Regions:
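Short hydrophobic/aromatic patch on the recognition helix
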Residues: 32-42
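Short secondary-structure transition hinges
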Residues: 86-119
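C-terminal peripheral helix-coil segments that are non-catalytic and often amphipathic
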Residues: 116, 120-128, 153-181
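Hydrophobic alpha-helical connector segments
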Residues: 51, 62-91
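Residue-level detection of the helix-turn-helix DNA-binding "recognition helix"
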Residues: 43-44, 54
């Protein structure tokens, strides 16, 4: 992916997370390109939407890979994933909104693959006896997406300082799944 494509995708996340029905002209303007340039890479809205979903999957895999490389402890790995993901709250909000309004069934296996990687970290922490045994993995994934949506709302509204959002996301997530002593 070249710089122009990446700029267009970043602009799509930014613009469409605020107004899902915004015209592609707004995306092109935010990316600093003409609409013709946008269409050179993404022939229509559907192709652009598909590319944003795939980019979010790719980026989330990258976040998990970085956490697993950076830390040996599964709890620290999970913390790194939650905190980094929370800083991308606008992208997760965009994805959830897109999935509500469009048919993205062809991408579900890719999203499920990401979820499985996150749940792998949860299971590693669970195996250490730290996760509430009554907390099913399906609930934990819903909690994860809820935290991402809350992060986006806080970032979007400016109601919480952006630097605080990742730590608050981790506090919320960890207090929701870990056993209290």
């Amino acid at each position: 992916m070249n710089k122009t494509q990446r700029n267009i995708l970043n602009a799509a996340f930014e613009v469409l997370s605020q107004d899902f029905s915004a015209p592609l002209d707004k995306v092109a303007d935010a990316a600093g390109v003409t609409r013709a340039t946008l269409h050179r890479y993404y022939k229509n809205r559907e192709v652009l939407m598909e590319a944003t979903g795939l980019e979010l999957v790719r980026h989330t895999h990258e976040i998990v890979d970085e956490a697993m490389t950076q830390y040996d402890n599964p709890r620290e790995q999970l913390k790194a994933v939650i905190m980094k993901s929370a800083s991308l709250g606008d992208r997760f909000h965009f994805l959830l909104h897109a999935m509500e309004h469009d048919n993205h069934e062809q991408h579900y296996p890719k999203f499920q693959e990401v979820e499985q990687r996150i749940l792998g970290l949860v299971d590693a922490v669970r195996n250490k006896g730290l996760v509430n045994p009554d907390m099913p993995n399906a609930w934990i994934i819903h909690l994860y997406y809820g935290i991402m949506t809350t992060s986006w709302s806080a970032l979007s509204e400016g109601s919480v300082a952006p630097k605080k959002v990742p730590e608050l996301a981790w506090q919320s997530f960890s207090s929701g799944i870990f056993l209290t002593k």
